[in-house]
């Protein structure tokens, strides 16, 4: 946001704006006209109250903003870096060792860095999703949706996964996530246990792009985020779940999933 502000690419709206339809309509208009990102400083919730948390939309709504968010100067830069890591030109690096410094930097940035406390743990909010400025964008939508949720789970062996699944608010404490139950959820179901889930909002751009990237099995989303950001990704232990979550996420919602065989449990 500070970067966008400095480049006059952040529109601040300081009057109340409804999170139901109004905020989405404004953002939609800006997207279609190559407009700036928009920060709603007084998002109005469904009950008519003003949220204490602002709502940012259209942060990646232009080609140029997306490149700058990833620290890239052109579309193939990140792909070129990945190819260099997977298929290094050993002959070149032996002749010109300094050419291998970017590769070394990316390799050192891969392992995530464990820290004691995250930004999203400084304040603990009541268990009420309706107090968050989660938009309802279209008249035919089934409800209010978190559209860029960073969903953290782990498999039966403790390997973490970061994914993005549109999350629908059902009530004050329940979210609906669209995912494949035969993966991590199935691992936990086979053990007769519910799966811990963290739904994180915000954080550095590399987290968002890592969560939506198709990655090989031997490269985790946290490692890829480190490569994208060119620095180790800080992660921290979730407060009430046995999960490592992004330490720089602004909000972290902690859940357990229902049984895939019986959603009422």
Residue positions per predicted region:
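Single conserved hydrophobic/aromatic residue that forms the stacking wall/gate
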Residues: 255-265
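Extended, highly charged
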Residues: 1-257
